[in-house]
C-alpha cells in the first residue's frame, strides 16, 4: 500500500564526512546519503550547512564508515551544526595523504575524495567525487589485502519522516551469486 511520508530511508550506511574547516582546522558531519561506483563516490548533505560550504570551498573531503561502538560520536557529529564536533566527540584522526581532510582513526573504512561535480537539488547538495585512496581497518581485510565482507559491520539508517532508527548486520552472509549458482568476476558475472 502507498505510504504518506516526505522522507524514506530504506537502509543506507551511516557515514562521517570529514572536511577542512578554517575555524576548527577539521570537522565532521553525518550523512546516510552516499553511493560508490568504481573510483567515484557521491555524497549528499544539506545545502548551506557548515560542511556543505566548506566542501564547496576546498573541493575535498573524506568518507569514514563508523561501527556501532562509536555511535555516541556519530550522534555528536550529527546534532551540533557549526561546532567543533571533532573536539566535542573526542575523535582522533590523521590528515589524509591526498586530501586535506581527516581520516578518522576509529572508523573501519575511510575514503579520500576530490570533488569533480556539484549538483544542488531540493535543499541538498550532492558532491560527485573521485576516490584518491581507501584506508581499511586491519580486522576487515585478509592476508592478501582483500575486504572480508563477513567482518564488515557498518551502521545502517532506516526510517521515514516519523521515526528513524539504526540497524546492524547479523552474522549471516552469502557470496554474490550463491543463491543461483553464479559468481561475480572482474569481467562480469559467470554462471554454471
Protein language model features and the residues they cover:
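Basic, polyanion-binding surface patches
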Residues: 1-192
Amino acid at each position: 500500500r502507498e505510504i504518506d511520508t516526505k522522507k524514506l530511508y530504506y537502509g543506507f550506511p551511516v557515514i562521517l564526512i570529514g572536511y577542512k574547516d578554517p575555524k576548527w582546522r577539521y570537522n565532521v558531519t553525518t550523512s546516510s546519503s552516499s553511493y560508490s561506483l568504481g573510483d567515484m563516490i557521491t555524497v549528499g548533505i544539506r545545502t548551506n550547512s557548515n560542511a556543505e560550504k566548506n566542501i564547496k570551498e576546498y573541493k575535498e573531503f573524506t568518507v569514514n564508515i563508523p561501527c556501532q561502538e562509536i555511535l555516541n560520536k556519530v550522534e555528536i557529529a550529527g546534532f551540533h551544526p557549526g561546532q567543533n564536533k571533532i573536539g566535542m566527540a573526542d575523535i582522533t584522526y590523521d590528515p589524509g595523504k591526498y586530501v586535506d581532510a581527516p581520516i578518522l582513526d576509529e572508523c573501519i573504512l575511510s575514503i579520500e575524495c576530490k570533488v569533480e561535480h556539484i549538483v544542488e537539488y531540493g535543499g541538498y547538495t550532492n558532491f560527485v567525487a573521485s576516490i584518491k585512496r581507501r584506508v581499511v581497518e586491519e580486522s576487515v581485510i585478509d592476508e592478501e589485502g582483500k575486504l572480508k565482507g563477513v567482518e564488515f559491520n557498518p551502521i545502517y539508517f532506516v526510517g521515514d519522516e516519523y521515526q528513524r532508527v539504526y540497524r546492524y548486520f547479523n552474522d549471516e552472509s552469502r557470496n554474490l551469486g550463491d543463491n543461483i549458482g553464479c559468481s561475480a568476476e572482474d569481467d562480469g558475472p559467470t554462471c554454471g
